[in-house]
Amino acid sequence: MFLLLVLLVAALPVNAEGGEIIWGTESKPHSRPYMAYIRFNDSKSVYRCGGFLVARDIVMTAAHCNGKVINVTLGIHNLKKKKNTQLIPVSEAIPHESFDNETLVNDIMLLKLERKAQLNSAVDTIALPKSKDWVKPGQVCTVAGWGKLANCTLSDTLQEVNLEVQKGQKCRSMSQTYNDSIQLCVGNPSENKATGKGDSGGPFVCNGVVQGIVSCRLCTGTLPRVFTRISSFMPWIRKTMKLLQQP
């Protein structure tokens, strides 16, 4: 999940599912009740992503976390302790219509759950931003997710880390497709902490409002990272949520 850069990355196997939880800390159990653990599969394998509950029956995640079968677990902290958690299949997945699977531009998706989540102290929704909300360079916000430890074993517990928003030109120098109007440039290279592949789809939370989606499929040791800027997609989000919630 949270990556100590370059040397440790080189030690990971090519098919590693996530980064390493280095410089991150274990979250207080159920302190982030909006977190969703997502498992999905295609014809070849089963994968994991993060996500977050935005309505009782809708989870937001990255569009590249799509598969033939998707299941969401809510209210979970330790993946080995499923008691009192809610496992809900996804009935419909709607990725953004302009999502590019190669560049990961417009990497946002809404999942309709087969049934509404039961809200409690461990399961709750998170606030979405307004369209005009603009996360600025220098802001420090938090990412949470489940990923691999430094020894390449899977983390059983939810981990979190604080990351600093960077100026867009830092990401433009690394990616020709970076677009500051719809993406966020996240992670201070001098701090050597970041997100990895296993954190895809997870929330970037600033002052209790989700402002970004981890949009990193094959993360290398280079910082900063590119996240989806949620505020830019609010018209699409409102329209799609209304569509998914029709009787």
UniProtKB/Swiss-Prot annotation:
Coiled coil stretches, renumbered: none
Chain ranges of the Peptidase S1 domain: 21-242
Name of the molecule in the record: Mast cell protease 8
Gene Ontology annotations of biological process type: proteolysis
This enzyme's EC code(s): 3.4.21.-
Disulfide pattern: 49-65, 141-206, 171-185
UniProt GO cellular component terms: extracellular space
Residues of the propeptide: 20
Classification via Pfam families: Trypsin (PF00089)
Sugar-bearing residue positions: 41, 71, 101, 151, 179
GO molecular function: serine-type endopeptidase activity
Family: Belongs to the peptidase S1 family. Granzyme subfamily.
Range of residues in the leader sequence: 1-19
Active site: 64 (charge relay system), 107 (charge relay system), 200 (charge relay system)
NAD found in the keyword field: no
Localization annotation: Secreted; Cytoplasmic granule
Organism for this UniProt entry: Mus musculus
